[in-house]
């Protein structure tokens, strides 16, 4: 293991894992970082980088060029799409699907059975560069659906079973089992056709 660079998960092709030779599994960001733990059934495609000090459950799948940074915990049966960035110190539950070009900043929490559409952007800094502040990403509770090109502002909570429509800019909490639409997002009743848990 080099002080800053490549390390490797033990026996990367064992335990029914498929890891492309152009993927980096175990990027050592400090001299004493620990190689990642990845469960059975993983498929990690070319260009993906997974840092040390990451814990991932079974049946993990990436697209091409995904990034998972340090101190991230990911549950079972999770998809991280092509060019999606998970910027570390983040907790993601099980049965989660993140599509292409999603950005997840540090200090974000994602529950179980959550869908995140392409090019969704989560944020954790309310005053970029201009003020010093604690970074706080959004919290997505269980069974949340996030549409394409949604922006979630720092520290907001999207409640259980809520649905955020494509293109919405969410500046405040979204109550459970509601629909958020528009810029800035307005809260509306959730249509019956969209109610119920996600089957991911």
Where does each model-flagged region fall?
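Flexible, glycine/small-residue-enriched loop-and-beta-strand segment within the central core
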Residues: 2-5, 18-156, 184, 191-192
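C-terminal substrate-recognition "lid" of short-chain dehydrogenase/reductases
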Residues: 156-158, 174
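Active-site phosphate/pyrophosphate- and oxyanion-stabilizing loops and adjacent acidic/basic residues
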Residues: 168
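Conserved beta-strand-loop-alpha-helix hinge in the C-terminal portion
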Residues: 176-199
């Amino acid at each position: 293991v080099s002080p800053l660079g490549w390390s490797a998960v033990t026996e990367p092709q064992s335990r029914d894992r498929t890891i492309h030779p152009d993927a980096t599994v175990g990027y050592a960001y400090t001299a004493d970082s620990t190689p990642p733990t990845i469960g059975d059934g993983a498929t990690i495609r070319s260009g993906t980088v997974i840092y040390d000090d990451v814990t991932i459950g079974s049946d993990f799948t990436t697209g091409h060029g995904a990034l998972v940074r340090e101190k991230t915990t990911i549950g079972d049966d999770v998809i991280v799409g092509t060019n999606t960035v998970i910027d570390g110190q983040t907790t993601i539950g099980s049965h989660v699907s993140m599509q292409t070009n999603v950005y997840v900043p540090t200090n974000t929490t994602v529950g179980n059975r959550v869908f995140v559409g392409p090019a969704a952007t989560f944020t954790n800094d309310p005053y970029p560069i201009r003020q010093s502040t604690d970074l706080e990403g959004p919290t997505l509770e269980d069974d949340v659906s996030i549409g394409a090109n949604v922006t979630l502002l720092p520290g907001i909570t999207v409640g259980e079973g809520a649905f955020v429509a494509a293109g919405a800019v969410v500046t405040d909490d979204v109550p459970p089992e509601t629909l958020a639409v528009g810029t800035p997002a307005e809260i509306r009743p959730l249509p019956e056709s969209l109610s119920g848990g996600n089957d991911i």
